[in-house]
Every structure is written in structure tokens, then in C-alpha cells.
């Protein structure tokens, strides 16, 4: 393949468009950040605040893990004494498996993937899909003390909302 320089021999402007375009910075609309308040205003974020931020005291951070990850690694977890082998199945405290569990407010198991082993999982919260998949494979789910408190609070708020209607 021929070089670009060689291909452009004989052309007047070497790919620069009109002969006027390569003079100074006029074709670019100025140098650097010039025109940010005038002719290039559309390239900048709008000024001012917008949106809503929830108060910090009501925000909760969840550490999550999918049942797929637990199921795929359960034999390794048992070898590392993180999971216990019992009656042909495995008992796993999910808080010991999730790396971010110490920094998070609670640990939740999500339902992505398949469950092939009989698992007894202990965690603060479970998605409906995770609960169904674990129980469908012959296992069970158990809530921690924190999980039971959270569930009781959720039921209280649901009852209060139902009373208001």
C-alpha cells in the first residue's frame, strides 16, 4: 500500500479541504476552550444543580452475589472450610463468601444462574428468584437476625401503607 504522503502528491491541499482552511485556528472555531460560552456552548454541560439526592441516613448499601457463583464454587468453599457438608448438601453462610460484606449494610443473594447442588444458604436477604431456585434444587434459605429484623420492618411499613389507603 502506498503511503499517505505519496498518495497526496499533486493535490493542492493534501486533504485539508479548501486552501483557506489550514490558516490559523479559524476553521476550528478558535484554539483550546475558546468559544465555550458562545459558538461552542452546545459542547458543555449545563450549569446549576438538578435532581434529588436521598438523605445519607436512609441509604443502605447491599453486597450482592448470584446463586450461580455460590453453586459453581461450593466444592471449593467446602475445601476452604467456608461451606459445611451436610446430608449430601452444603450449608453456606453467604456473609463469609461475599468480599464486600463487611462494608455493606446487608448481604443479598440474587437469582441469576442455575442451582445444581442442594444448598442451605444463610444471608440477610434473598430475591424471589434465588429463593425459588435454591428450594427447587432441594435446598433451603435461612435469614440472619438482621434479615429477620429487616423483614419485620418491611412488613410494618407495608401494613402502615395499607392502612393509609
UniProtKB/Swiss-Prot annotation:
One of its GO terms (molecular function) is structural constituent of ribosome. One of its GO terms (biological process) is translation. SUPFAM superfamilies: Ribosomal proteins L15p and L18e (SSF52080). Residues 1-29 have a biased composition (Basic residues). Residues 1-59, 133-165 are annotated as: Disordered. Keywords: Ribonucleoprotein, Ribosomal protein, RNA-binding, rRNA-binding. Residues 154-165 have a biased composition (Acidic residues). HAMAP family: Ribosomal_uL15. Binds to the 23S rRNA. This is Large ribosomal subunit protein uL15. It comes from Haloarcula marismortui (strain ATCC 43049 / DSM 3752 / JCM 8966 / VKM B-1809) (Halobacterium marismortui). The lineage of its organism: Archaea, Methanobacteriati, Methanobacteriota, Stenosarchaea group, Halobacteria.
